[in-house]
């Protein structure tokens, strides 16, 4: 196909399409289509496309071909932009305005909702329950039909009426000397000068302040900064059955004054006067009664009115006061404080490793060491645990004499007395008191997140957790996984008739929302799971379930690979969910590579033919069957079976029969596993979603190896040990995170080739004459860069109510460098020209410079010859970023003792990209290295040398190894879902 052109007549005849290079037009009722004309966003080649409305439409193509440019950057962006444009300028100021995509016309657009993987909540307060709004309904349920209990003795409590309280008082011994009090101030700071006048006018004469009774006209002077208790004396009487009416009236009045709370003092003092007396615990017995919830055994443990906000860990009424509702606390970790191999004098205490030998801090610690008999000149590992504890936590109020030679506030030669606070209390105090973000982040290097010791991760106050429904509190419900929650909700929960009327509609909504989560393959997730620990695929499917629950119609949904992280077994549920969304009369537009999803689509659009500048065209559009029969479509060839990823002819055996063995893995849902990873081969860890793959590989294996081999400050999940680490010298985790967070990062800087290019330019005659060094050719520092745009090539202009506009720098015209730097040339090209070259062009240009050409060739080999050397890192897809990382590893000299860990490397990759990726990974393993891959893609699984399959289910029903062996051995195993699906791929 030349320049994307096709025989128009043939296309019209075969498909009813008009497609000269980038057109797919359908002749039907125009109201039934989203009509796109002249789309040129990013790499799109002026394409025309008709997308049927109210259908499940899949857009596919190679990584970087322009799928997201069409689906998200054009269709969704324009739908969102039109909605926001319709709002007032004031509203637009808060919402922000999206740039208008580059196209001629788009008609037939509906309101658009994007469900991608990038908008996952990073808020530590967000959980699966809050994101899906299930928690809102649980809070309402507990507030309306929850049964409160005493948080101390756990007995059920209920409200008391005035009559109940009076009857209880009348049961006291006849002749008891009683004083009835109404609390009006409880543990509050202030002078409370208004109380005397306010209550004298109402006819009261006495008040008890901090346990002492005063006449109201002799109200004491109170300390403003201290907390006080003040109770109004409502009545005094000696208990007699004949006083029932008076006592009842007084109690009713006291309850009104005390806002539902009263105190009854049973006075043991026989004197007639009470003014000025301290009526405290020594001579009185205090009885507390409440119209609110209160325990008869522990009346001081008052339970507030049950309302929804009480059950929120984001509200002060319900949140645990220690962790403020987070369930965790940042605490200094002693293991991160010490460098066990160094002495204190050499900097063995990491937070203070830069202090001078004559510093106040070190001299004070030397005084501590002298008193407790240890030296600051021996390695920390040789100190006793008691001595380390002294260093970490201090020595209390003990004082030490420290002689200082200094200036400023310290007099030279003077001796000062000081306590030694300890490393951890010092860091905690500074972290709390500092206003400097830099200092706070610096201290946080030595902190780790630990479970809150007050609420033990429950996030709520004890009084809230004491409210139950059928024996379960709200945290117990949230600790259930979705499947278990559905099991409980499907039972007939017993309520009174009145409670059932309230609970039934709430339970119905909860049941529906939880069922939608199960339908998208998330049955293993616990509702209390923090949202910031979810993978992109999990977060996307949660949002998908939430959208289904909304029941909207006539909406355009745009999804980005919802099948990511989903086992083939759960894929059918996801497809059924997408169809359900479509059946609600919505248009569902999905960017996807999964073959089952493509074959289930109503309409399929194939973008290509290649990636980057060589992509951006509609190669084929139609039903999946039509695409499969189109010889021009690369996707069609894989769908029809005309093209396949070959099965390896042989499977590698472990190198020298060596293994990396994880012993006693118990983190999260792992069931005390011992797992052997063979060295020198490609191992795939497979299994249903939530079975424990990421916990085993990422949280235990990767974190432990990074800490042991690279001294990274990573914390491995709970396990006993890992054997065989001595057979490795490096552990490299290759994920799909960006290669840089700013537009200044690019492939040239990430791979390190830009250093060699700058050094090459510095050796050119013109550069040597002018005395230019390599730094002159950096756009990040002063010297060679354009100072007008500071090396960006563009200037940002703020437009307030309109989107920010980026205009080409008028000084350098987008070249990033000043005139002097651009006057230095190599083979007729300046440094800016080189950055604008594609990798393919650069390989040819630098063919005689091996230090540059060899690194560039590895990028070319991973299929990224189309990207530009200076292309911004923020423009790359996850698949492209990962392949740049793999190329960087390929260009390094292999030791044959490296472990590579990849987590779902096929994310965002077309089947043809997967084929290319497997060849690259095979090269890394062929050098004697070890590869461990977490993957659901059956093409990768069938290409492995060894498979570790986990299950049998997700969540608490997972965490076990259910099968190990070669792909052929796994395929014969009927007990594993992976094996059942793998059989078809091995035929």
Residues of each region from the PLM?
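Conserved phosphate-binding elements of NTP-dependent enzyme cores
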Residues: 1-987
């Amino acid at each position: 196909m030349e320049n994307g052109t096709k025989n128009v007549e043939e296309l019209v005849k075969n498909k009813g399409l008009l497609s000269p290079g980038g057109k797919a037009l359908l002749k039907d009722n125009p109201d039934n289509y989203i009509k796109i004309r002249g789309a040129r966003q990013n790499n799109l080649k002026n394409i025309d496309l008709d997308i049927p409305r109210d259908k499940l439409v899949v857009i596919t193509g190679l990584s970087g071909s322009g799928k997201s440019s069409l689906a998200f950057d054009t269709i969704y962006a324009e739908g969102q932009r039109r909605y926001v444009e319709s709002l007032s300028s004031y509203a637009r100021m808060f919402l922000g305005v999206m740039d208008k995509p580059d196209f001629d016309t788009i008609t037939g657009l509906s309101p658009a909702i994007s469900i991608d993987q990038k908008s996952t909540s990073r808020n530590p307060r967000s959980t699966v329950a809050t994101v899906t709004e299930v928690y809102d309904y649980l809070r309402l349920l507990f507030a309306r039909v929850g049964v409160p209990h005493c948080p101390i003795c756990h007995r059920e409590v209920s409200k008391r009426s005035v009559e109940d309280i009076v009857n209880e008082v009348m049961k006291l011994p006849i002749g008891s000397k009683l004083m009835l009090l109404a609390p009006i101030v409880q543990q509050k700071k202030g002078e409370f000068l208004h109380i005397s006048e306010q209550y004298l006018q109402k006819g009261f004469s006495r008040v008890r302040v901090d346990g002492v009774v005063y006449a109201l006209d002799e109200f004491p002077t109170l300390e403003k900064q201290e907390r006080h208790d003040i109770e109004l004396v409502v009545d005094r009487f000696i208990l007699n059955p004949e006083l029932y009416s008076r006592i009842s009236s007084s109690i009713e009045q006291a309850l009104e004054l005390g806002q539902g709370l009263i105190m009854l003092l049973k006075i043991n003092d026989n004197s007639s006067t009470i003014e000025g007396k301290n009526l405290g615990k020594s001579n009185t017995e205090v009885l507390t009664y409440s119209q609110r919830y209160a325990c008869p055994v522990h009346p001081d443990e008052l339970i507030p009115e049950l309302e929804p906000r009480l059950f929120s860990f984001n509200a002060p009424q319900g949140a645990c006061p220690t962790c403020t509702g987070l369930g965790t606390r940042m605490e200094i970790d002693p293991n991160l404080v010490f460098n066990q191999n160094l002495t204190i004098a050499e900097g063995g205490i990491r937070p203070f490793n830069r202090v001078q030998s004559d510093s106040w801090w070190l001299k004070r610690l030397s005084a501590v060491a002298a008193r407790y008999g240890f030296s600051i000149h021996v390695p920390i590992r040789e100190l006793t645990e008691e001595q380390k504890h002294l260093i970490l936590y201090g020595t209390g109020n003990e004082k030490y004499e420290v002689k200082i030679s200094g200036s400023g506030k310290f007099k030279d030669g003077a001796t000062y007395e000081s306590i030694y606070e300890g490393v951890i209390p010092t860091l905690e105090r500074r972290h709390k008191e500092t206003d400097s973000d830099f200092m706070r982040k610096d201290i946080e290097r030595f902190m780790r997140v630990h479970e809150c010791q007050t609420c033990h991760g429950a996030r709520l106050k004890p009084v809230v957790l004491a409210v139950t429904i059928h024996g379960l509190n709200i945290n117990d419900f949230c600790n259930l996984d979705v499947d278990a929650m559905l099991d409980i909700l499907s039972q007939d929960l017993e309520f009174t008739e009145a409670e059932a009327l309230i609970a039934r509609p709430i339970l119905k909504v909860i049941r529906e929302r939880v069922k939608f989560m199960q339908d998208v393959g998330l049955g293993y997730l616990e509702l209390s799971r923090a949202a910031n620990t979810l993978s992109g695929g999990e977060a996307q499917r949660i949002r998908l379930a939430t959208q289904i629950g909304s029941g909207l119609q006539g909406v355009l949904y745009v999804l980005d690979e919802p099948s990511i992280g989903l086992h083939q077994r759960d894929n059918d549920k996801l497809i059924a969910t997408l169809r359900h969304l479509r059946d609600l009369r919505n248009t569902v537009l999905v960017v996807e590579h999964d073959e089952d999803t493509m074959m289930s689509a109503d309409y399929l659009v194939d973008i290509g033919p290649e990636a980057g500048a060589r992509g951006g065209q509609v190669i084929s559009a139609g039903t999946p069957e039509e695409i499969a029969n189109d010889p021009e479509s690369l996707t069609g060839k894989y769908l029809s079976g005309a093209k396949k990823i070959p099965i390896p002819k042989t499977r590698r055996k472990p190198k020298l029969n060596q293994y990396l063995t994880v012993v006693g893995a118990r983190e999260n849902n792992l069931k005390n596993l011992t797992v052997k990873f063979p060295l020198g081969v490609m191992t795939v860890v497979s299994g249903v979603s939530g079975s424990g793959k990421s916990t085993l590989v990422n949280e235990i294996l990767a974190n432990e190896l990074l800490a042991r081999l690279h001294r990274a400050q990573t914390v491995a999940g709970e396990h006993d040990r890992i054997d065989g680490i001595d057979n490795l010298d490096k552990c490299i985790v290759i994920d799909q995170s960006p290669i840089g967070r700013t537009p200044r990062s690019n492939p040239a800087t990430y791979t390190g080739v830009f250093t060699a290019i700058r050094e090459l330019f510095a050796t050119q005659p013109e550069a040597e004459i002018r005395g230019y060094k390599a730094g002159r050719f950096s756009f990040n520092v002063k010297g060679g860069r354009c100072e007008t745009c500071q090396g960006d090539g563009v200037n940002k202009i703020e437009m307030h109510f309109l989107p920010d506009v980026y205009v080409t720098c008028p000084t350098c015209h987008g070249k990033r460098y000043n005139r002097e730097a651009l006057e230095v040339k190599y083979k007729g090209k300046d440094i800016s020209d080189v950055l604008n070259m594609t990798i393919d062009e650069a390989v040819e240009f630098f063919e005689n410079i091996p230090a540059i050409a060899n690194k560039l060739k590895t990028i070319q080999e991973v299929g990224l010859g189309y990207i530009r050397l200076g292309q911004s890192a923020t423009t790359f897809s996850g698949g492209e970023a990962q392949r740049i990382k793999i190329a960087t590893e390929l260009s390094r000299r292999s030791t044959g003792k490296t472990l590579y860990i990849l987590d779902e490397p096929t994310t965002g990759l077309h089947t043809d990209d997967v084929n290319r990726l497997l060849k690259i990974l095979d090269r890394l393993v062929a050098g004697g290295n070890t590869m461990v891959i977490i993957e659901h893609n059956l093409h990768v699984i069938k290409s492995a040398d060894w498979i570790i399959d986990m299950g049998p289910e997700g969540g608490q029903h997972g965490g076990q190894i259910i099968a190990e062996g070669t792909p052929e051995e796994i395929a014969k195993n009927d007990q594993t879902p992976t094996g059942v699906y793998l059989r078809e791929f091995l035929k």
